[in-house]
């Protein structure tokens, strides 16, 4: 299904379950595609938040929209880890200094009992456990980066090159 079809479904006034997404997007104070650059753990990082807005409690929050071929309501902390979303959540929380939420929208259209098309939608707020796992993954990545590219590099990236035909 085309992303335009999903966007049209989300933005339709007839789609009650996505009213909260429309409210976030239509907030006149929301900042869209907000870039940032910062230093974190001795390295420069850049990011671009899809949306910075206020949530239902009035707190500023970063919203990142994702489409997925899986069923978003089946996601768990291991799914977030396998796609690196925990690292993204950790980095954005550190870079922007505010909470973070993902809104996942399934790509596969489904039909309800009346034949009406819908998509799975799931809002995920990373737990402290997930953020901690993200921090661990970021630190592991920085360790690898330092090993091959840092000032005191101990490995040559060209020596780890493998070429195969499978």
Question: What are the residue ranges of the model-derived segments?
Answer:
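Metal-dependent nuclease catalytic regions and adjoining charged, substrate-binding loops involved
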Residues: 79-86, 91-166
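Short, mixed charged/polar active-site loops
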Residues: 44-46, 60, 119-121
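Conserved catalytic cores of phosphodiester-cleaving nucleases, focusing on short active-site segments
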Residues: 47-75, 92
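Metal-dependent nuclease catalytic cores that hydrolyze phosphodiester bonds in DNA/RNA
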Residues: 1-48, 158-166
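A generic structural motif
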Residues: 37-39, 52-54, 105
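Short, solvent-exposed loop/turn segments that connect beta-strands within catalytic domains
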Residues: 41, 56-59, 111-114
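Surface-exposed cleft-lining segments at the edges of enzyme active sites
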Residues: 37-39, 71-80
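Secondary-structure boundary elements
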Residues: 23-28, 53-60, 94-100
């Amino acid at each position: 299904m085309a992303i335009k079809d999903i966007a049209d479904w989300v933005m339709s006034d007839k789609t009650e379950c996505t009213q909260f997404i429309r409210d976030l997007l239509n907030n006149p104070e929301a900042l869209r595609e907000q870039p940032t650059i910062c230093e974190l753990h001795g390295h420069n990082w850049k990011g671009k938040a899809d949306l910075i807005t206020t949530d239902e409690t009035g707190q500023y929050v970063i919203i990142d929209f994702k489409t997925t071929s899986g069923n978003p309501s089946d996601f768990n902390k291991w799914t977030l880890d396998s796609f690196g979303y925990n690292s993204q959540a950790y980095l954005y929380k550190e870079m922007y200094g505010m909470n973070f939420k993902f809104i996942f929208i399934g790509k596969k259209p489904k039909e309800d009992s009346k034949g009406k098309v819908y998509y799975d939608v799931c809002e995920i707020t990373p737990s402290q456990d997930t953020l901690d796992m993200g921090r661990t993954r970021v630190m592991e990545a920085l360790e690898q980066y330092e090993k091959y590219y840092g000032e005191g590099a101990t490995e040559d990236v060209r020596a780890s090159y493998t070429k195969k035909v499978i």
